[in-house]
Swiss-Prot record:
A zinc finger (C4-type) spans 38-70, 259-291. This is Zinc finger chaperone zpr1. It comes from Schizosaccharomyces pombe (strain 972 / ATCC 24843) (Fission yeast). It is found in: Cytoplasm; Nucleus. GO terms for cellular component: cytoplasm; cytosol; nucleus. The lineage of its organism: Eukaryota, Fungi, Dikarya, Ascomycota, Taphrinomycotina. The gene is zpr1. Belongs to the ZPR1 family. Gene3D superfamilies: ZPR1, A/B domain (2.60.120.1040), ZPR1, zinc finger domain (2.20.25.420). Acts as a protein folding chaperone for elongation factor 1-alpha. InterPro entries: Znf_ZPR1, ZPR1, ZPR1_A/B_dom, ZPR1_jr_dom, ZPR1_Znf1/2. The keyword Transcription does not apply. Keywords: Chaperone, Cytoplasm, Metal-binding, Nucleus, Repeat, Zinc, Zinc-finger. Pfam families: jr-ZPR1, Zn_ribbon_ZPR1. GO terms for biological process: 'de novo' protein folding; protein folding.
Length: 459
């Protein structure tokens, strides 16, 4: 019954636009109108509310306010769904003017940054906009008081004008740049296009800190200080406990930890697994009975190899889909025939089969990006998504041959060799020297592993 009521309230933008009329508005269907106070002039204006489903994303409430007395207008978006179990950071590299039309869903907690011009937009009102719309808002906000600054603070006026010119150069589409949306609620999104973005679009999920959970109201601020301290140090306690206990590969060890979603205590289960012809890895699973959060991770250990490793496998039939695969957090995965390109960090660490990994990719893309509500997509976009998902389904069912490329700069990933210890005729393994930039991103350039005790004691 609750689900049916929810479906009645939330309709797609296209359906709402087709069905809304003046009579329906008065009855509370479609767009709803509410009289509300104007914060500019103090008189009453009108707020319009639309409960809708964004095809690229999830259910939201679109709000638009207009005051007939002073002409003030305002629009914002609020999420109607719950806070996600993890935060998310989405990065997209803009190359041309067409990319500026990408849809952006930005929650009120999201921080937008463009490193090329050292721009960071803090969280404020939620927005349903485009990349160009975000840049336009920046220009509008900076231009508001420019006339008064020209007389009172000419130096500041010139500095802001110079920055506005930089933003306008990005708006023209002639200068490539990178935009990042970091949202601790996990409720923000940048539109992606399958088979076209390559390595330009990436998403990384992360666990929230205690401070972030407190900001979102997920932690009881009235709890004793010692409980907060215990919660804040739970992850460190888990690490110390894991290293202090002798791990038996035949047992599942359980440690007390903290749920990254609601910050309440829960149990983390850990098991040591020996992968033949590879190394020992740790599989960790967390389940929170309070909020239902679930997480499965694979951690590899040992020293960092001097070289990276790229594994290429020709998947010939359904039998190859049963091969075990360990994709570490630092590994990227590509399937050129499908136009599939997963950045390092996507899906986290996973130990499964090729079929299982493709199923996870399908579920993530279909549930997160593509849905049956495709009214805001162009026919070409719908066709591209349908073809991409169809090809992905054929690959996971063994109906088509493809090439799987697993590239890990830390050599912490694994792909099962059916012929081990002999070479696999359909698999090639290449070792390569990591570039300075890759080592910089991994934090290896400044890492000191020898005589650090002596250097640490210098004053």
């Amino acid at each position: 019954m609750a689900e049916e009521k929810k479906e009645e309230l939330f309709t797609s933008i296209g359906n709402a636009a087709q069905n809304v009329s003046t009579a329906e508005d008065r009855e509370g269907n479609g767009v709803q109108e509410v009289e509300s106070l104007c914060m500019e002039c103090g008189k009453n204006g009108t707020t319009k509310l639309l409960l809708t489903v964004i095809p690229y994303f999830r259910e939201v409430v679109l709000m638009s306010f207009e005051c007939p007395h002073c002409g003030f207008k305002n629009a914002q978006v609020q999420h109607a769904e719950t806070i996600q179990p993890e935060g998310s950071k989405i990065t997209f590299h803009v190359e041309d003017k067409e990319d500026l039309n990408r849809t952006v869903v930005k929650s009120q907690e999201a921080i937008v940054s463009i490193p090329e011009i050292q721009l960071e937009i803090p969280g404020r009102l939620g927005q349903l906009t485009t990349i160009e719309g975000i840049l336009s808002n920046v220009v509008d906000d900076l231009s508001k008081e420019q006339e008064s600054r020209k007389e009172s603070a000419p130096q500041l006026y010139d500095q802001i004008n110079a920055f506005i010119e930089k933003v306008n150069s990005l708006r023209s589409g002639s200068v490539p740049f990178t935009i990042t949306v970091d949202d601790i609620t996990g409720n923000s999104w940048i539109e992606m296009k399958p088979g076209r973005d390559g390595d330009r679009w990436s998403q990384v999920s992360y666990k929230r800190t205690l401070e972030q959970n407190t900001k979102l109201g997920l932690v009881d601020t009235d709890q004793p200080e010692d409980v907060k301290t215990q919660t804040n140090n739970a992850s460190n306690t888990l690490k110390h406990d894991a290293t202090a206990v002798e791990v038996d590969p035949n047992e599942v060890h359980t440690f007390h930890a903290t749920c990254p979603s609601c910050s309440h205590q829960c149990d983390t289960h850990m098991k040591l697994l020996d992968i033949p012809h590879f190394k020992e890895v740790i599989i960790m699973s967390t389940v929170c009975d309070r909020c239902g959060y679930r997480s499965n991770e694979v951690k590899t250990g040992g020293e960092i190899p001097p070289k990276g490793r790229k594994i290429t496998l020709k998947v010939m039939d359904a039998e190859d889909l049963s091969r075990d695969i360990l994709k570490s957090e630092t590994a990227s995965l590509k399937i050129p025939e499908l136009g599939l390109d997963l950045f390092p960090g996507t899906l986290g660490g996973r130990f499964t089969t090729i079929e299982g990994l493709l199923a996870q990719v399908y579920d993530e893309l279909y549930g997160r990006v593509f849905s049956q509500e495709t009214d805001s997509m162009t026919p070409e976009q719908v066709a591209n998504w349908q073809q991409f998902l169809c090809n992905l389904t054929a690959a996971r069912e063994g109906a088509t041959q493809f090439t799987l490329i697993l590239d890990d700069p830390l050599s912490q990933s694994y792909l099962q060799n059916y012929y081990a210890p002999d070479p696999d005729p359909n698999m090639t393994i290449e070792e390569y020297e990591r570039s300075f930039q890759v080592n910089e991103e991994l934090g290896l350039n400044d890492m000191k592993t020898e005589n650090y005790e002596k250097d640490g004691g210098k004053k």
